[in-house]
Amino acid sequence: DKELLNKIILTIKEVRKKHGVTLETFYFDTGIHLARIGQGKTNISVSTLSKICNYFNLSLADFFKLLES
């Protein structure tokens, strides 16, 4: 669902900016290319989303609460 993917992308972006982390720093630290996900060039898996949440010390449950708000 493209709408859900867009919400996930926007929520990741908000969390990343809240923590003051650049795309480059995030990629260097995790190897996850958020720009590709954000541009819709690749889909996001649950395991990738889990890695993103772990990086920001956020549970998947809390991430989805942010997604709904």
Predicted segment positions?
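Short, basic-rich loop-to-helix N-cap that marks the start of a DNA-contacting helix
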Residues: 41-54, 60
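The alpha-helix within a helix-turn-helix
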Residues: 16, 27, 53
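A short, Lys/Arg-rich alpha-helix, primarily the initiator
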Residues: 1-19
